[in-house]
Amino acid sequence: MLMPYRRARYDILLLSLVSFSFFLLLQAAPVFPDPDSFYHTKIAMLMREQGIVKNFPWLQMTVLNSVFADQHLLYHLLLIPFLSLGLPPIWGVKLATAFFAWLAI
């Protein structure tokens, strides 16, 4: 018979595994549900290769044309380890999404 605190640990571990598996299942489609995901993926890949992105010339028709600011800098930094796992970029971001969702609970 397990002691109550050991039982609680197993329950937490089981809940963690089930919830992470559920979040992975939600990411199972081979597409991104939102087109912004491609932007975030590419910025994180550029940051991995070149460092902090200070110029982004592909935004000619936006207010960010003359002065680019990465409004999601920390998110892009958090994506870099997942994009460095050797998986295709789309799967690295999907794994990161499931991991961040799991951390939120």
What are these regions (language model features)?
Residues 1-25:
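Start-transfer (signal-anchor) and selected internal transmembrane alpha helices
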Residues 11-15, 88-96:
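Membrane-interface starts of transmembrane alpha-helices
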Residues 95-105:
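Transmembrane-helix motifs of polytopic, lipid-linked glycan transferases
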Residues 42:
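Mature N-terminal segment immediately following signal peptide/propeptide cleavage
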